[in-house]
Each structure stands twice: as structure tokens, then as C-alpha cells.
Amino acid sequence: TSFLTGENVPFYSQGTYYATGYSTFEPTMGITSTDNIYFTSYGNGPAGSTAIVQCTNMIEMTSLSDFSCQNVYGPFLPVANSNDPYVYVDPWTDRIMKFDMHALGGMTVEWSDDEGDSWVGPSLATGYSVQDHQTIASSPYGGILHETLWVFCINGNYPAPLCSASQDGGLTWGPELPGAPVDCQSGGLSAHIIGAENGNFYRGQIGCDGTGYSMYKTDDGAITWTEHVLPTEVSGTADTWNAEEAQVDTDSESNVYAMWMGNDNMPYFSYSLDDANTWSEAIMVGPSHLEGTGFPVVIAGDPGKVAFGYVGTEGDGVWHGYISVITDAFSPSPLITTVQVNAPDDPLDNASPTCGYERCGGFGDFIDMQIDAYGRPWLSLSHNPSGDTGIMGTLTNGPTLLGNVTSLSPLPIGGTQTLA
């Protein structure tokens, strides 16, 4: 009997990218319900601040001339450029949160509730020194004075990440508390935190005993955290610049999806249907012709529908961008469809043969990924040969990751013609 039944069926799929016209570094991104895409552009805002670039009419466009990108961060007193630029869009309220780390000495948050037309803040997010590798998310856990709870985690002077919560939408922040169980020795570096529909927050990194990867969960608003070990016995774990990271996302029903790089530098995936308490057997999700991958990120839509973003190489010294899609992750034999977002003669990096294993051009430490309201994944990347240009990789054709599995409406091919 064929396993290609139900939602586990093939769709014609093709990848492309669209250049934004702005350089980037560690390109985090978000999408609002008005179909605007936002991403960070290091140093290109007013007075040398981090720009928050808004791309309009890119989602569901029919012609390349439809979309445009511009900076929308322009407060009267802009915050100085961030050492680690970061933007996050609250999926439940559309609040655009700009989260800046300043020379390892502290962090500020600013936000916009009107698509970047006006900005509130900055507010001080921490009173401690030596802060790095910050990450922020929200969930409908419910703040006391705001409809969503906000949590950030950082790498500080502690054996595990330190995390803080805001009950009022980012105006004030509670004390930084350990983001792991007592006596955890995971180190402070971790992947991005995410908030689930059921109010849980998750963050992936090295296990408390210093081995493997684990998922860390809080169900009480970042007061306490529990460790949930991922099934890395077969895959092993990467030994690269970002080896500490296990990426995570949740679907519309709060099922949990984890992604990490194995000791073969290939991407692996597992899911949990019980709040990270147990995990499925891990599977490798990258195409077999790749010899190595890096900068993993995962995003989920409705249950079983998940996309993975990463860069990869065939061993020829150049690196490309990839999106792998699964429309029925719970199938005994899930079909994995992978597209390359750039043409073979248009690599995303051709200067470093080990780009995916190190801090590399505009990729920095990480990339980001989101799903729009139509079920299409968007992957924020850097086009290093053109000067670290921020680009949005996506599917011109392929399956939707929301609702019944059908074909996405086609988008025009982008690529190098959008770099001009």
C-alpha cells in the first residue's frame, strides 16, 4: 500500500528569493496580519540604528513590481545600533518588538502597534551586565496588564540561560531567573525561544549534563523550567560554531517540532504530541546530495505541517539556501519536499567553504523563518556575495501549511533580478 495518501502527497514545488535592498546581519523576521514582512537591517536605521525594514505587497504578489521594502523605524530619539539586532512580531496581537543588545552591557525593547508608524520605548530589559545572544517571544499565557506574556532569555554569567518575563507588554520586566532546572550545566547559549498557543514557552540547546540536545519548557511564565531530552542517540550533535542550538516551533494546536544538526552536519527532526514529554524517532530531513548544512530553523503551521530552513553545500565550497516541507509529519513515512531558493550559479556564499559551520557574513549566528496567513513559509537569509543583502526565500509553488493541503497560489520568480 502506498504511503502517499491523505495529506502525505507530493506537490509541484519551486523555490526563489526576493532581495530587500538592505544589508542584514542575523536576519530575524516577522509577519503581521496585514501581510507585511518585517526584518532587521544592522546599522541602516536613523543615526546608525538598527533598521526595521517593512516589505509590503511581497506576500501573494503577482508581479515583482508589486513589492517594496522600506525602513519604518524612526522614533524621535532612535536607540543606538545594536550589537545583536532582533525583531519579533507577536502572532496574537501584531505588536512589533525591537529587541536590542548593547555591547554586552544590557538590552532595550521598543515596540510598535501600528505597523511601524510610531514606536514606544525604549524600556530597559535588564539590570545586569554581560548579556549576549538574546531571544524574545510571546504567548497567550496572559500577562497581568497585557493580553500576551512576553519572555526573553539571554546568555549571561550563569551556567544556563537567564530569562525574564513582562506582564505589561514589554514596559517593565521581572528579575532574570534561571531558564533551566537547578544545577543545569547547559551553558548560556541557546536557540530562539518560541511561545505556544497553550501558553507554554520552549527553547532548545545542549542538555543539562553537557551532552546531546534538550528542549526546555516553562508552563508558568518563565518562573520554572523543565528539561526534555531530544532523541539524538543516532544522529549525534554537531561540532560547529552553532553546535549549541536545537531549534523549536509549535503548531496551531501546540504540538512541538524540534530540529537540530547531527554530527554529520545534516538536519534532523522530531516531534512531540504531549508538550515535549515524549518524542518521535528522529529522521534526517535534508536531501541526500548535500554534504553539509548549517543555520537551522523550523516553523510549523497546522498539525503535521512543518517547514525547515537551512543553508547547505554539495562539498564544492559554495553554499545555497534550502526549504524542506512536510505536510504530514505524523505519517509513518513522511514525504519531504525540498527546494533550493537560489539558482546554482547564484550562491548565498562563495567566500568560505565552511560558511554553514561558522559565523559567516550576514548570517551571523542565525537566520529566521515564519509562515504567512496563506500557509507559505518565508526564510530570512543573507546574500553574502552582493554585500550581505537581506533576502526572503520562499516557495513560488508548493503546498500550503495551513488548512487542507492544497497548492499555494503561484508567485513570480525572483532571484538575481531583484538584487539590482
Residues covered by each model-derived region:
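A short beta-strand segment in extracellular, disulfide-stabilized domains
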Residues: 418-420
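Extracellular, repeat-based ectodomains that mediate carbohydrate processing or recognition
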Residues: 1-416
